[in-house]
Each structure stands twice: as C-alpha cells, then as structure tokens.
Amino acid sequence: MENCLPRSLEKLQQILQISLEDLPFGCIFCGKLLGAAEKQLFKCTGLCIVWHKGWPYGTCRDCTVLSCALDLYCHLALTAPALEAEALVGQEISSWFMRCTVCGRRLTIPEKIELRARNCTLCCIDKGQYFQWRGHCSSCKLSDQGDLGGYPPSPGSRCGECDECCVPDLTHLTPVDLEELGLYPGPEGTYPDLVDLGPGVFGEEDEEGGGLFDSFEEEDPGPNQCGCFFCTSYPSGTGDTDINQGPAGAAGIALQSDPVCFCENCINFTEFR
C-alpha cells in the first residue's frame, strides 16, 4: 500500500486537486506545520514525502539543515576534491546523484559541473546500503552557512557537562574503497530518498485521531545532562533562557553557539537521505 502512495508534493497535489497553500503538511522531525514558503522550499529541494499513519510529512528548513549536519558528523565516509572523487568513482560528476551538504537540495547539472571546475571538496556520506556524495549548492556556498565553520561543533567535541551524549568522534575513520563498495546505483537500481525515523519520535494519536502534529513535550533534563538538538530539553548552563522549541528553535543556536550534543537515540534513528 505504501509503495502506491505519492512521494512528491507535486504528485500529491495532483491526486488531491488541492493547492500547496491548502495542503496540511507537517515536519516529521519537530511536528510543526510547514508554511507556504517552507512547503515550496521542500518541493524545490527534491526531497520525498514520508507517510505515517496515513498522513504525509516533510521537513522544515531548520530540521533539514540539522539533519544534514548530523549526517556529516555521524555518517561521513571520506572527503575528497572533486577531481579525485571522480577518479575514484569512474563516472563524470555531472551524472551523479548529489545533494547539498548544508541544505539537502538536489544539485543541478550546472552546479555539479561548477564543483568539478573549481575542484571543490566533496563529502561522501555512508547510508548503510549505499553511498551519496554531497557538495555545496550555489546558494549555500555564498551564504554564511556554506562555510564549514558554520556547522555545529567539531567531530569528537563534548559539551563538558555530561557523559550522556556527545558529537561522535570520527577521527579514527579511514577512507573507504568506493570501487569495492559500489557507489551507484542503490540496491534496487534506484537512489533511495527517504527520511528514516526510529521509535518514539511521533506524538501518539488520541481517541479522536488527533495528535499527528503534536510537538515534543517539555522535559526536565535533570542535573548533568545537556540538550540534544532533536530533543526539547534545556541545555545545561543556559540559565533562564528558554530554547525549548524543538529542533526548529534550536537550529539558530546550533549554528552559532558553543559546542552542543546529539543524544544516542537521534544519532541512531534520525537519518536524512
């Protein structure tokens, strides 16, 4: 049944005969309803719809950026200049399926050609059953977020307040032999493009069927615990500052604050593809 459900906003609009503005569409990470601008951005980014309990979900801009950063820190296989990466794969970069390292948008052929011409550094993300190369899109490379220094904390850093969670240490990783692993295509001859989530992320439905777009409940983090980007705890040392707004509220802080953490559940279950 799920295989028959539309995976793009455009297809869903055609089936429902509804405008983008009138389509109820929530973020699968933080649960908020996307506005018209964010729905249009999701559509242009080329991401796929995720279905849960009969409802379509996407991702808001903030959660998409954080999910890309989480991919970079938790699933990075190697980085390589564009020409070197092209030699490893044995295919022209223009034929690759690529997404932006920062915003997740699917790169156009001109953008991929420019990455090759400038010999930009590319990131190879290990998605378990397949690999995906990423580079900066034309928009992100011109913005502040396009600088690697604008990402959340460096790999291996800790918050200093707890032992519960930390940014994974990737310093021990070695380059992967992509030719042996097989970069393209995916297991079924296609490029999977799906947000995968683990248990306990969604709000439960009540007896009347509501709760599909519920946000996370506020929790007391207790002593010696810091806040994960994808949880709504108060990070240690924030005093009376209220940033208990889920990942959407934490995104602005994450991209310009001191080191913060990802909890183990988010590292294991939150994947952006």
From Swiss-Prot:
Keywords: Activator, DNA-binding, Early protein, Host cytoplasm, Host nucleus, Host-virus interaction, Inhibition of host innate immune response by virus, Metal-binding, Modulation of host cell apoptosis by virus, Transcription, Transcription regulation, Viral immunoevasion, Zinc, Zinc-finger. It holds the Pfam family E6. It is found in: Host cytoplasm; Host nucleus. GO terms for biological process: DNA-templated transcription; regulation of DNA-templated transcription; symbiont-mediated perturbation of host apoptosis; symbiont-mediated perturbation of host ubiquitin-like protein modification; symbiont-mediated suppression of host innate immune response; symbiont-mediated suppression of host type I interferon-mediated signaling pathway. GO terms for molecular function: DNA binding; zinc ion binding. Gene3D superfamilies: E6 early regulatory protein. The keyword DNA-binding applies. Belongs to the papillomaviridae E6 protein family. Forms homodimers. Interacts with ubiquitin-protein ligase UBE3A/E6-AP; this interaction stimulates UBE3A ubiquitin activity. Interacts with host BAK1. This is Protein E6.
